[in-house]
Amino acid sequence: KPQILFLESKGYSIIPVTNGRDAIDRCKTERVDVVFLDESMPGISGLEALAEIKRNRPSLPIVMITKNEEEDIMEEAIGSQITDYLIKPVKPNQILLTLKKIIDNKRLVSAKTNSDYQKEFQQIFSTIQDHLDHKQWTELYKKLIHWELELEKSSDNGMKEVLNMQKQEANVEFNKYIIRHYIDWIKGKDKDAPIMSHNLMAEKVVPVLKADPNTPTILVLIDNLRLDQWRTIQPMINESFRMVQDDSFYSILPTATQYSRNAIFAGMTPLEISKQFPTMWKNDDDEGGKNMHEADFLEAWVKKTFHGSIKHQYVKITNHRDGELLENNIMNYMNNKLTVIVYNFVDMLSHARTEMEVLKELASDEAAYRSLSVSWFDHSPLLNALRKLADKDINLLLTTDHGTVRVQDPSRCIGDRETTTNIRYKTGKNLNFEERDVYAVRVPEEIGLPKSRLSSSYIFAKENKYLVYPNNYNHFVNYYKNTFQHGGISLEEIICPVVKLSRK
């Protein structure tokens, strides 16, 4: 046959058989990389042969060739996990292209991705050096994430190293940008400021509630969800929902739950919260949980924003059992105007990864951390709960409170006994530190933060630095190196996803 001669001329070795039974036998005894299976053969049908081959060799790629364009035949073949489907008459070049897709796909994708990134490398480098505004920084970060996810498909570690260097350069410049503008943003002096934690509800939730008051709005906040993690779980969400708006906001400093999430639900800076709710706000050195009053802050925000209460509910998920209850009760929230669901898993994963050796191995870098997050989300009660809402008329908002960064460079820091233990930021008095490694704020009120003592100040670790005390310095350097932490200044911690979804 001309197809066989053509493929042999391209260097492929062909095993021709005339019926399904022979195909099954040869697949058992020969080293076969791909099977092209005619749907109509003497003896058993192509679909029957397909099922038998798959039983023996589940991962073997099989391409079905047929002249039958009936939908049910195609659906049955696709349901049997064929790799591709060709309709007769089949040209030799079609078979060649299919082979390249199957056998050479990884190599070809890797080569093309590397080539495309190389072409864009200089443009990204130039962009990093420009004077970017907050929107341009977000776009640059999204572009870096895009290439990070693309290069994951490549086996060329050299290109990944180049991209990591670009990310580090970007974070150096991003830190300068944040330090230059942050005080003006918090004080409301910069009209071009990004959406931030304390005005996220006003900018993203209020417009939805006012534009569509009769449709239930559900806000899901997955804590500690980086933008790249969102990108990897997004395809699972897209299966059930239509993306209406894919946006982002900037977390306030410190990029830590007690600050950013309380600010989100109160709709005010931590300094304003501490003044308005002095018994509810907890400073770092106070005892007790720091996020125990989110429902109270939300209640106060709703009353203030809507001049009276609307039917709303706050739900917090901190373990798998809570998640299962959420999945079972999700339809009850359709009776609320606003439902806020805080899902705590990713933050727990981040902290556990620091403390558990097995998780250090499972999430050794960003790619592994993303993979672990995808696996969790795919099997989580949260995804099951969202799927139950997929055909309902709702406004679904999904966001986070802050991101996280893999720390790699230790920086010495000295404080007194009251100084906080977080290794990405510190607050206390008499702080000694390496000036070049941190953003130091000696008047916390300037950036909307309360102080627990008259002389308290804050320092925030830059880029991928982490703050380590001199006592047992080497032990803690090694203990925390390459762990995921938050509280400081980096693209990964500050630029957060906020998306609006609706039913398809």
Give each language-model segment a name.
Residues 5-6, 40, 64, 75, ...:
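Feature captures the catalytic ectodomains and active-site-proximal regions of enzymes
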Residues 18-22, 45-48:
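Acidic catalytic/metal-coordinating carboxylates
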Residues 25, 47-58:
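Short amphipathic alpha-helix used as the core "switch/output" element in two-component signaling
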Residues 30-36:
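Active-site beta3 strand of CheY-like receiver
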Residues 48, 69-84:
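Alpha4 helix (beta4-alpha4-beta5 surface) of REC/receiver domains from two-component response regulators
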Residues 65-69, 89:
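Conserved active-site segment of CheY-like receiver
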Residues 90-99:
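C-terminal output helix
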